[in-house]
């Protein structure tokens, strides 16, 4: 058996493809032995990340979203990398949301970080965004 399983997916930056990515990654997580609660967390995080990519590329069908999901059997870790071709943004402005002043939008990254074991964000204005999310089999 290989030490890593890798699934690569490139989809148009359209809302209809959010579910395709979610189903693909959740099927991989199930195959690798994640429990239902962890799979649901992964599905919510994927939905948030891919929806953000679609929104920030303005649903431009010529723009693509690249997804790489990999599971390492030694570290027992699922890693999901999502890259878009959007405008990027200045990540220094990201703040912890004030729950008492909730508004529509702005919670995606907060939700992703609360559900996944590790999250790394690489974004530069004018160069798109890459988010890498990790979930360990059996929790932290």
Task: Please give the residue ranges for each predicted region.
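Conserved ATP-binding N-box helix of the HATPase_c
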Residues: 36-61
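Bergerat-fold GHKL ATPase/HATPase_c domain
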Residues: 1-44
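Residue-level detector of secondary-structure transition/capping positions
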Residues: 29, 47-50, 86
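Conserved beta-strand-loop-beta-strand hairpin that lines the nucleotide-binding pocket
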Residues: 1-8, 53-140
